[in-house]
Amino acid sequence: MMRIGLLGFGTVGKGVYELTSARTDMQVVRVLCRRELQLQDAEVTHDFNDILNDTTIDTVVESIGGLHPAFEYVKAAIEAGKNIVTANKALVATYYDELLPLAQKMGVHFRCTASVGGGIGWLSELERVRRIEHIDYVGGIMNGTCNYILDAMARMDLSYEEALGRAQALGYAEADPSTDVDGIDTWHKLIVSSNVAFGVSLDISGIPAAGIRNITKKDMDTFKKHGLLCKLISTGKCTDGVYSAYVQPTLVELGAPEAAVPMNYNLITLKGDVSGRQSFFGQGAGRYPTAYNVVQDCMDFLNGRGFYCSYGEKVAVNNEEKRAYYVRGAVDAWLQANADETWGEAIVTKPVSVQDMHNWLKEHPNAFIAALPEKTL
């Protein structure tokens, strides 16, 4: 029987405990929790060392979130020879280059299926696909909070502030929504997805992210006039050994699959050179969808399955591919030189490199950009 040390007893941790309690092949035996807690089948501790030094615990499930002390706990557990399951996309994306080689060196298993797509099982599917074919694209709608806000603005004719307020009232958005609306959550998920899909370790310093914070109702009205909707889209590509990766608001045609994704749902897509386009739809968060894939990872350990791919070489990101952009909120000489037409108060650019557009946005943080549609994958 697998003996589990559970770090954290919040939304995900409680779900993991409930799902494993009904099983005979695994058991949560110790739980790290800051608050006072009584559990029938597990010992509750405030000291991580109680889990670390328990030699009967073979697997640690990290569900405390954030970078610290999650990183220190996970690293110590790996060094102690314990398998790791985590749903913490920030942890995996930020410390991929340290934790993955360490796990392989120590001969322990490491999986994080729930870190991208919640209950969708996206990373496990990437693992299966790449056994047979080359994956040249991953991406799509990876953040339910942003999708809810954009969907509410489009369907209910709300302002950004009104849509955000509804998302917060429903529990889809935090009191401080920055990680979601600034694209950071999607950025983390794209990094993990791209590394698994392409079997490399992308240089994350070269991956830009633009969010939806500055979008307005007037922007949405303009998009509607042109038969378009706005979605926050992640893009990772591998073309002839050249890697690109970025997160940005993107305009999609009404008939595109992404346009039909409602509320807080995700739609994540891969494109392989044999099977073509495959898309995966579902809720990207929640207690049971997320806990479900944590337990699936534990079951994979029982069947001898470790990480989704071997740790790959460090590679640079090249975002020189060209896209046309809708830009509103700032104007300078570079933008005027690359203007193609105007949509109301906004400029639509000629095709410019993704990197140049994001560099421009860094200098004009109050502006809003959205890439125009590109050819269907």
Annotate each language-model stretch with its function:
Residues 65-66, 77-95:
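ADP-ribose/adenylate-binding Rossmann-like module
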Residues 257-322:
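ATP-dependent carboxylate/acyl-activation modules
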Residues 3-18:
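Glycine-rich adenosine-cofactor-binding loop
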